[in-house]
Design a protein with these regions (language model features):
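Residue-level detector of alpha-helix boundaries and kinks
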Residues: 10, 37, 112-113
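Acidic, metal-coordinating catalytic segment for phosphate/diphosphate chemistry
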Residues: 34-42
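Sensory/regulatory domains in signal-transduction proteins
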Residues: 46-161
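Short, low-complexity N-terminal regulatory "tails/caps" that precede and couple sensory modules
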Residues: 1-33
């Protein structure tokens, strides 16, 4: 079995975040994010083919804004970053500067409506390569007290530019 040091997505904090991501998605879209399985949710979400990311609840206009709190294996591969580098970085760094205004507008809309579907935008990987995401879904994350504590996004439709 993989140790938590080798599998940071299996730490108690990451497991709780995976549960918030999955429950927030189900609440927002009235269906599960990933198919139910006998494996632990945190492992299944990390291994999912769909790209899944989440950031904390810092204000979009506060300093560097929200920081990533989760990225599954598909996200890590797409952005070309390891967990330790991706998780904790400002989420705005997933997009190039020219795209950050439209990204921030979509996040604000999703925050106001609790969820949106059909978002498209251009992102940038670690090496500066640009890629288009299409039909992304964005939703609010909720803590145990029912307060908004971040946002998540998923998509499977993307291509290099």
């Amino acid at each position: 079995m993989t140790s938590q040091a080798a599998a940071p997505w299996l730490t108690p904090e990451a497991i709780a975040t995976a549960e918030q991501i999955a429950s927030g998605y189900a609440q927002a879209f009235d269906r599960p994010l990933i198919a139910p399985s006998n494996a632990p949710l945190a492992q299944e979400l990390f291994a999912a083919a769909i790209v899944v990311l989440a950031h904390d609840g810092r204000a979009l206009n506060q300093g560097e804004g929200p920081r990533l709190i989760y990225a599954n294996r598909s996200a890590l591969r797409l952005w070309g970053r390891p967990w330790a580098e991706m998780v904790g970085m400002p989420s705005k760094n997933t997009a190039e500067p020219a795209e950050q205004t439209s990204r921030q507008q979509a996040l604000a809309t999703a925050q106001h409506q609790n969820a949106i579907s059909g978002y498209s935008g251009i992102r940038i990987d670690r090496q500066g390569r640009r890629f288009q995401i299409n039909r992304a879904q964005l939703w609010t994350l909720w803590n145990a007290s029912g307060e908004a504590c971040g946002q998540a996004a998923c998509f499977s439709d993307w291509w290099w530019l």
